[in-house]
């Protein structure tokens, strides 16, 4: 135990020992996890299997990352920023076969599918105007309901304010109201971080590999048939093609001349190539209605590998 924590309680002693600069093992684990989050592949894989006989693919890189996280006093946000500004991270994603005997040298990030949460949040931005609507009320929200001038308030006024707060922001009442305002066919259209977990097996997030929270590294990005069917014909796809969704309203208001650009920019974050534009316009014109044509193009873009994978 470091001398600085010699007289502290045991929890503080444990924390001090764990993060001490002489105990590099913990720092290596943290640095390796952040590297994998950014680059798609850890220097040590699996990331929760640090053993003497499981050698890092690049020992020098792991030691450098460990030195950095210790220098930064475990400031994970700063280490993330450093990696994000590196030329390795900013290169085009590379295809890597995990079963290959060849060591990956990190010429760039590994091409990988978005996590379940990333896919969900990407879709929600195309659907909901306020994806944060399920958050707890802010102090300003509560103040607008319980607005009392305590210099002149009496017991009756305080009781009225308390009743108003209970009717508006009591846990059960508030949660039910949020679900009513933000729900569609039993699914809350809010960011993944706002949804209580673990979710039922049939939910979009679980189908795409969200962790069941029963074990470390329980999340998966393995492709399955239900995932394909969900993207083809699931509730989230249906609501996106209806009036009132963000993408639908923006495409319709843009008009035929700009609609294709809006769809490509919103879903794939780039403008269409001349060939892409010709194919999209042809599909829109051949549909039963302009709106149906827009829906067909949106559906096609959502089901591309370009949308699902981080490049």
Task: Name each model feature, range by range.
Residues 226, 302-305:
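Residue-level micro-sites within transmembrane alpha helices that shape
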Residues 226-227, 295:
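Residue-level detector of short, conserved catalytic/binding motifs and their immediate flanks
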């Amino acid at each position: 135990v470091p001398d600085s924590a010699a007289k502290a309680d045991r929890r503080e002693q444990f924390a001090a020992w764990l993060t001490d600069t002489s105990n590099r093992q913990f720092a290596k684990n943290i640095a390796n996890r952040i590297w994998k989050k950014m680059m798609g592949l850890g220097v040590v894989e699996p990331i929760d299997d640090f053993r003497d006989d499981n050698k890092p693919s690049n020992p020098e890189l792991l030691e450098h990352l460990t030195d950095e996280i210790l220098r930064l006093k475990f400031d994970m946000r700063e280490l993330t920023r450093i990696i994000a500004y590196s030329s390795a991270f900013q290169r085009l994603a590379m295809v890597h076969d995990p079963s290959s005997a060849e060591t990956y040298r990190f010429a760039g990030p590994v091409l990988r599918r978005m996590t379940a949460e990333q896919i969900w949040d990407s879709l929600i931005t195309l659907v909901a105007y306020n994806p944060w609507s399920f958050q707890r009320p802010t102090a300003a929200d509560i103040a607008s309901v319980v607005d009392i001038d305590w210099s002149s308030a009496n017991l009756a006024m305080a009781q009225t304010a308390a009743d108003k707060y209970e009717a508006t922001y009591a846990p059960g009442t508030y949660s039910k109201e949020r679900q009513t305002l933000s729900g569609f066919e039993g699914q809350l259209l809010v960011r993944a971080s706002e949804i209580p977990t673990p979710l039922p097996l049939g939910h979009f997030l679980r189908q795409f590999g969200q962790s069941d929270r029963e074990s470390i590294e329980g999340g998966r990005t393995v492709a399955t048939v239900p995932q394909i069917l969900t993207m083809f014909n699931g509730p989230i796809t249906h609501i996106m093609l209806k009036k009132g969704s963000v993408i639908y309203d923006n495409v319709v208001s843009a008009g035929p001349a700009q609609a294709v650009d809006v769809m490509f920019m919103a879903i794939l974050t780039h403008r269409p190539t001349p060939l892409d534009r010709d194919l999209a316009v042809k599909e829109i014109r051949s549909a039963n209605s302009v709106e149906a044509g827009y829906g067909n193009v949106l559906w096609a873009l959502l089901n591309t590998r370009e949308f699902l994978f981080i490049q």
